[in-house]
A protein has these predicted regions:
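Bacterial peptidoglycan biogenesis and beta-lactam-recognition machinery
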Residues: 8-15, 66-75
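Soluble non-cytosolic domains of exported or imported proteins
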Residues: 24, 40, 52-59, 124-131
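Extracytoplasmic/secreted envelope proteins and their assembly/folding machinery
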Residues: 3, 43-46, 58-62, 66, ...
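Low-complexity, Gly/Ser/Thr/Pro-rich intrinsically disordered linker/tail segments
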Residues: 111-133
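Short conserved micro-motifs at the rims of enzyme active sites and ligand-binding pockets
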Residues: 60, 108-113
C-alpha cells in the first residue's frame, strides 16, 4: 500500500477502512512494516498536487495522508469518486448501471472523501499548483 512508503515502519498505523456493501464486510488497512522499495519516511515534507480530475484511489491516498498530517494537499478539490464500482444488469433488458459497491471510511475523521472529494490545504487552480507548492 503506497501510504506505507510515507510512514515509519513502527508503530503500525490504521490508514483506512473499506466497507464492501456486497459482502457487508469492513476491511481495515494498516501500514506495512516492510516494503519492497525504499521508504520515504516521515522526516521529509510531502506535497500532493490535485485537480478536479483526481479520482478514485488517488483521492484515497491524498485523503489518508492529509488526515495523518503527513502531506499538504495543493490544487483543486478532487472529483469525489469511489474505491470500487460494479456493473449491474437492469432486469431482462440490455441496460446496465454502474454503482459504487465499496466505501472508504477514514479512521481519523470517520468520514469518506467520496461524493465531496478531498479539499486542498492550499486551494489554487490545477495549472498553478506546482508553482504554489
Amino acid at each position: 500500500y503506497i501510504v506505507s512508503y510515507f510512514t515509519d515502519p513502527e508503530p503500525l498505523i490504521h490508514i483506512d477502512s473499506v466497507y464492501d456493501r456486497t459482502a457487508d464486510l469492513t476491511i481495515e488497512l494498516w501500514s506495512m512494516p516492510t516494503l519492497l522499495g525504499k521508504r520515504y519516511g516521515t522526516s521529509k515534507p510531502l506535497i500532493i498536487l490535485t485537480s478536479k480530475d483526481t479520482l478514485g484511489i488517488a483521492e484515497d491516498v491524498a485523503y489518508c495522508l492529509k488526515n495523518l498530517k503527513r502531506a499538504t494537499i495543493v490544487g483543486e478539490n478532487t472529483a469525489g469518486g469511489t474505491v470500487k464500482m460494479s456493473k449491474m444488469k437492469v432486469g431482462d433488458t440490455d441496460f446496465y448501471v454502474t454503482v459504487p459497491v465499496a466505501k472508504s471510511i477514514n479512521p481519523i475523521t470517520g468520514k469518506s472523501w467520496e461524493i465531496n472529494g478531498v479539499a486542498p490545504d492550499v486551494d489554487v487552480a490545477a495549472e498553478d499548483a506546482l508553482d504554489a507548492a
